[in-house]
Regions:
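N-terminal amphipathic/hydrophobic targeting modules at extreme N-termini
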Residues: 2-20
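Asp-based phosphoryl-transfer active-site loop
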Residues: 40-54
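Short, structured coil segments at secondary-structure junctions
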Residues: 92-95, 102-103, 200-204, 257-258, ...
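Short active-site oxyanion
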Residues: 72-76, 95-97, 183-185, 240-242, ...
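Conserved acidic, metal-coordinating active-site core of Asp-based
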Residues: 14, 130, 134-245, 249-254, ...
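Active-site phosphate-binding/coordination module
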Residues: 54-154
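Mg2+-dependent phosphoryl-transfer enzymes with acidic/Ser/Thr/Gly-rich catalytic loops
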Residues: 37-41, 58, 216-297
Length: 297
C-alpha cells in the first residue's frame, strides 16, 4: 500500500452539510432570536456526566433537563461517542433538542442530520495499519456502525460491552475492509509505542489521551467545541449563551468555547481546572444542583 499523504486526505475528506439556507434562516429568524435572548443552549456529555459507568441516570438529572427545556432553554447531547454508539433509549427518553456526536464530527437538530464529517477511506486504511504497527488496537467509529476486530479484544471487557450494547451495529474491520464510513477512531493503547504513533499521524489527527489507556483520534481541528460553535451558528445564537457539562479530557474543548463550563465532581483534576464551576458527582445530583445554581430551573 502506498503511504497516504495526510494533507491530501484532509483536504479530500468530505464534509457533508445537510441543511438548506432556508432552514438556517428559519432557525435563526429574528422573532425566535428575540424570544431566546435570555435563554441558554445547554450541552451535556454522556459518560460520567448524564450517567455513571453502569449507565445509571439519576432521577434528578432527568427532572433537571426536562425542567430547563420547559423554561425555554435548549438541551443537546454532546458526546465523544460516535452516533452509532448513542442508542440507549433511556437517554432519548429524557428529551433533547439535538445531538453533537463524535467529538463534533456530526450534528443533529430536530431529528435531522445537518452536519457530518466523513474520513477519507484511504486515510482510514493508512491509520489502521499505522496504529497496529505501533501496538494499538483500533475501533472505527461512524454514524451507523462501529468496526472492531474481535480477536484484538477477545480478552477485553470493553469489546464485550460494545457487543452487548450495540449488537448488529458492531461490524468487523476486516470483513468491511475499505467500505467503512466513519468520522473518528479510538484505540486501546496499553502496550503501544504511543509517542511514535502520534508523531506519524499528527498532521492528520488531534489526539485526546485519557487516563485509562485509550486515545481518541479525531480529525484535525475537530472537537466538541467546534461542534458547539456550528450549532450556535445554525441557531443564530451567541456562543456566550451556552453552557456545557462534562467530566473528561474530551470535554475540555467545549469548556474553552462555551459561556460557562461545568465540571462534574467526579471529573479529573485537569478538567476541573478548565471549568467555570464544579458541581457534585453525577450520582450526587450534580446536574440538578448546577442547574439550580445557574438559574436554569
Amino acid at each position: 500500500m502506498n503511504r497516504v499523504k495526510c494533507d491530501r486526505c484532509l483536504v479530500g475528506a468530505p464534509v457533508i452539510f445537510l441543511c438548506t439556507v432556508h432552514e438556517r434562516r428559519t432557525w435563526g429568524r429574528k422573532q425566535e432570536a428575540e424570544e431566546m435572548s435570555e435563554k441558554k443552549v445547554v450541552f451535556f456529555d454522556i459518560d460520567g456526566t448524564l450517567w455513571n459507568w453502569h449507565n445509571e441516570i439519576p432521577e434528578s438529572t432527568i427532572r433537571a433537563i426536562r425542567s430547563l427545556r420547559q423554561n425555554g432553554h435548549r438541551a443537546f447531547l454532546c458526546s465523544g461517542r460516535s452516533r452509532a454508539y448513542i442508542q440507549n433509549p433511556d437517554l432519548f427518553a429524557i428529551g433533547f433538542d439535538g445531538v453533537v456526536s463524535g467529538c463534533g464530527t456530526m450534528i443533529e437538530y430536530g431529528g435531522e442530520t445537518i452536519f457530518y464529517k466523513k474520513l477519507d477511506v484511504d486515510l482510514v486504511e493508512h491509520t489502521v495499519n499505522t496504529v497496529r504497527k505501533y501496538g494499538m488496537r483500533p475501533i472505527l467509529e461512524g454514524r451507523e456502525y462501529l468496526y472492531m476486530d474481535e480477536r484484538e479484544f477477545a480478552k477485553d471487557n470493553y469489546g464485550k460491552k460494545l457487543k452487548a450494547e450495540i449488537g448488529p451495529r458492531l461490524l468487523t474491520i476486516a470483513d468491511e475492509w475499505g467500505r467503512w464510513e466513519i468520522s473518528k477512531i479510538s484505540c486501546a493503547t496499553e502496550t503501544a509505542d504511543r509517542e511514535k504513533c502520534y508523531e506519524e499521524l499528527k498532521d492528520c489527527f488531534d489526539f485526546i489521551i485519557h487516563d485509562i489507556p485509550v486515545t481518541e483520534f479525531v480529525p484535525k481541528g475537530y472537537h466538541k467545541g467546534t461542534g458547539i460553535a456550528k450549532v450556535c451558528e445554525m441557531l443564530d445564537t451567541d456562543i456566550k449563551d451556552t453552557i456545557a457539562f462534562g467530566d473528561s479530557a474530551n470535554d475540555i474543548g467545549m469548556f474553552r468555547v462555551v459561556g460557562i463550563g461545568v465540571a462534574m465532581g467526579n471529573s479529573s483534576e485537569d478538567v476541573k481546572l478548565e471549568a467555570d464551576y464544579v458541581t457534585t458527582p453525577v450520582m450526587e445530583d450534580g446536574i440538578w444542583k448546577a442547574c439550580k445554581h445557574l438559574e436554569l430551573i
